[in-house]
UniProtKB/Swiss-Prot annotation:
SUPFAM superfamilies: Nucleic acid-binding proteins. PANTHER family: 30S RIBOSOMAL PROTEIN S12 FAMILY MEMBER. GO terms for molecular function: rRNA binding; structural constituent of ribosome; tRNA binding. It comes from Azotobacter vinelandii (strain DJ / ATCC BAA-1303). InterPro entries: NA-bd_OB-fold (IPR012340), Ribosomal_uS12 (IPR006032), Ribosomal_uS12_bac (IPR005679). GO terms for cellular component: small ribosomal subunit. This is Small ribosomal subunit protein uS12. Belongs to the universal ribosomal protein uS12 family. It comes from the Bacteria. Residues 113-123 have a biased composition (Basic residues).
Length: 123
């Protein structure tokens, strides 16, 4: 425990909270252009081909973003919207693409949890 005299000479340091999504720069989403669309494999206990894309954002950052849902229409030069949210079993993937906005189509034949995948209500 510090004495009052010590605290007068040197006050306690404020802890600065570090952002989980620095490339967004305090914005809810960011627009960017796909520079590469590819699949990658997850960490140890899991096995799959996860769809990801490398995105050059409007603020100059280049980030890796996960493409959720079954099937997608993204290719190089597609314009996408990026939101925060990491993928636990893909190291270095800290962003998600927003389905159903800009060049990203919604998930086809999606019946439940549609709003997260940009799917319209079935007739």
């Amino acid at each position: 425990m510090a004495t009052i005299n010590q605290l007068v000479r040197q006050p306690r340091k404020r802890l600065v909270e570090k952002s989980d999504v620095p490339a967004l720069q305090n914005c809810p989403q960011r627009r960017g252009v796909c520079t590469r669309v590819y699949t990658t494999t997850p960490k140890k206990p899991n096995s799959a081909l996860r769809k990801v894309c490398r995105v050059r954002l409007t603020n100059g950052y280049e980030v890796t973003s996960y493409i959720g849902g079954e099937g997608h229409n993204l290719q190089e030069h597609s314009v996408v919207l990026i939101r925060g949210g990491r993928v636990k079993d893909l190291p270095g993937v800290r962003y998600h693409t927003v389905r159903g906005s800009l060049d990203t189509s919604g998930v086809k034949d999606r019946k439940q949890g549609r709003s997260k995948y940009g799917a319209k209500r079935p007739k």
